[in-house]
Amino acid sequence: MTASPVLGNLFIIAAPSGAGKSSLIRALLEKHPDQSMQVSVSSTTRAPRPGEVQGVHYHFLSTEEFEQRIDAGEFYEWARVFGNYYGTSRKVVESLLAEGKDVFLDIDWQGAQQVREHHPEVRSVFIVPPSLEILEERLRVRGQDSDEVIAERMAKAQAEMSHYHEFDYLLVNDDFNNSLASLEHIVLAQRQKMPHQQIRYSSVLKELLG
């Protein structure tokens, strides 16, 4: 049985800081080492941090180059955060999808709105913590932020979570393994939808139907 090439699926994975999004995505990729799934590498104008590698963690661009790409319409979505640009490259995403890879966009609800304008078929997942108390505890365990910064993050998290209803799926990350299984089911089920299966098994269907 020969399967025909098929485009990968595009997913938006969004969550407030501390909900466990990055850990879930990382664990899902580790479960599928065949590289059939991949996180899109964003572009940014901020300076690389120690240990960050060009093209692996981010595509680092100058402000001038980033703004030129905005004018040329080369981003699905972009935003300016604390004086630095961040964006999702059309070319990067479309190249990965053409290779048949499922692509995850790690963006916020505002970026999700922009992406839906270009990719109405995108599937989106919003991840939330089981409670505000647990979210604050997770932020404090990191040991990276002051009380003031944590308070700001909590306020921002509540504002972000008010947009949960704009997404296709909602995951409450109260148990990591259960949440990982749910995220995996969402991704794998999308691969079985009719448009993809019709392309993937076009030769089989042609033979069966004569």
Swiss-Prot record:
Cysteines paired by S-S bonds: none
GO MF, one example: ATP binding
Chief localization: cytoplasm
GO CC, any one term: cytosol
Catalytic activity: GMP + ATP = GDP + ADP
InterPro entries: GK/Ca_channel_bsu, Guanylate_kin-like_dom, Guanylate_kinase, Guanylate_kinase_CS, P-loop_NTPase
Entry-linked SUPFAM superfamilies: P-loop containing nucleoside triphosphate hydrolases
Family statement drawn from the similarity comment of this UniProt entry: Belongs to the guanylate kinase family.
Protein name in the entry: Guanylate kinase
Source organism of this protein record: Idiomarina loihiensis (strain ATCC BAA-735 / DSM 15497 / L2-TR)
